[in-house]
Amino acid sequence: LDYLKALGINNLRVLVGADGKDGIPTKAEPALQVEAGVYNDTIFDGLDFFLSELDKRDMYAVLFLNNSWEWSGGYSQYLYWAGHGEVPMPNVAGWDAFSNYVAQYAKSEKAHHLFRDHITYVVNRVNRYTGKKYSEDPAIMSWQIGNEPRPFGEDNKKSFAAWIADCAALIKSMDSNHLVSIGSEGMAGCEGDLSLWTSIHADANVDYTTIHIWPNNWGWIDKKDIPGTIGQAIENTCFYIDMHVQEAFKINKPLVLEEFGLPRDSVKFTSNTSTVQRDRYYRAVFDIVEKHAAEKGVFQGCNFWAWGGFAEPQH
C-alpha cells in the first residue's frame, strides 16, 4: 500500500472474497465463502486488516461482491449451490458449455437469494480492527454488485436488469453512506446493447457508471503483430470511451474506466518480457483520462487491472 500510495494511487478495486471449495484449477484460493453462508474467518480477518490499513493512508476501496467468471466462484458457484448441477469449467468443458451454464443465473431465484444473503452478511460485518461496521467504514468508496456482470443471452436481459436493480436497492437499504456501482464492462457486457447499459445505470440506487476495455480479449489487436495493430486498438478505445461518456452524460452520472490492460510484447507473463506496446497503450489511455479531467466532465477516473504486488504467499 505504501508503494501504491507513493505512486499517487488512492483507489483500489478489490474482490471481497472467492466462493466455493479450494483445490479447483483456475479458481482463486483460499476462498472466503466456502459453502453458502459459511465463511473462512481468516480471510475475513485479512479484509478487515486491509481496510483498516487503507484508512490510515487515506486510500479507498471499491469492493465487488460477485463475478460472472469462474476464477472466484461467482455466478457458477451460486448456481451450483442452488442445485443447477456441476459447473462445466471453461478450461475443461469449453466456453460455450460454461456460458450456457451461467446463463441460468439471470433467472435463478434460489441463486439470487443466496447472493442476497451474502450481500447482507458482508455489508453488516464489523471490522475487528476498527470496530466499525463495513456500512460505516470510511475506507470503502463503493459497493460493487459484481465483476463484469452479464445477462449471458438476449432472453435474459430483462431478468438481468431486474436483478441489478434488486441488488442495488438491497445495498442502499442497509447502507446509505456508500456509493453503489455495478461493475459493468459497458456495451460489451450487455449483449452489445448500449441502451441496456444506460438503463441499468439510470437506476436511482446506482451512483455512477463503469466500463472495462480489453483490446486483446475483444480482438482489437493481433497477438502476432501487436506493433502493427496497436494503433487500431487505441482508436477503438477512444471510440468506446466516447460512446459511454455520451450515455453517462445523458443520465447525469459519473463514468469510471475501472479496468483496462494489454499483454506484454510477446504475450508472456515473465518479468523480463518487454512492454513497449503496452506502455504506448497505457499512455494513450491516461492521455484520454487527463483530457477529460481537465474538461471536468462526466469521465471522473480510472483503475487498471491488475496489481499483484511483490509478495508471494506460502499457499
Task: Briefly describe each language-model feature range.
Residues 1-221, 229-254, 260-315:
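Active-site mouth of glycoside hydrolases
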